[in-house]
Regions:
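Acidic, polar-rich low-complexity tracts and alpha-helical solenoid repeat scaffolds
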Residues: 4-146
């Protein structure tokens, strides 16, 4: 039985090890390697699925959302950020997740109505945070954007 367990290994730890190795080779100078970006997006999701209680999961999902944005996958990034915001209530970057949802709707997807609702949600849920202040500022500028 021990041989079977050793052969199978701890997949969540090996996934975390893979993430750490990939992060070390992700950049060539200032440029993110596209092949590593794809592998990291998959690995962050794998870790969350394999071991949702792992302490790195919220940060990994946040990094995955960032990679989705850099890949131009804005709708997927919005879903990832919403899931992270709603699924990890103790995550310290929740206000930033909510703000980024609004920002993506505003700047990348150019949907002023969804952006407005998302900015208002940040203000309501995260009062007193820098993200709430940025949301209020963004709302003031929203009607003036082309």
């Amino acid at each position: 039985m021990a041989a079977i367990l050793l052969a199978c290994g701890d997949t969540s730890q090996s996934t975390f090890d893979r993430i750490q190795a990939l992060e070390k080779e992700a950049f060539v100078g200032d440029s993110l390697r596209a092949d590593v970006r794809r592998q990291l997006m998959v690995s962050y999701a794998d870790l969350a699925r394999e071991q949702p209680e792992h302490p790195f999961v919220p940060e990994g999902l946040f990094r995955r959302a960032d990679l989705l944005i850099s890949a131009g996958k804005y709708e997927q990034a919005v879903l990832q950020l919403q899931d992270l915001h709603d699924g990890y209530p103790a995550y310290e970057l929740r206000p930033r997740c909510a703000f980024l949802v609004a920002f993506i709707h505003d700047v990348h997807l150019r949907d002023p109505e969804l952006a407005r609702r998302a900015y208002e949600r940040v203000i309501a849920l995260h009062e007193g945070t820098p993200e709430a202040e940025m949301s209020a500022q963004s709302l003031r500028w929203l009607p003036q954007r082309p």
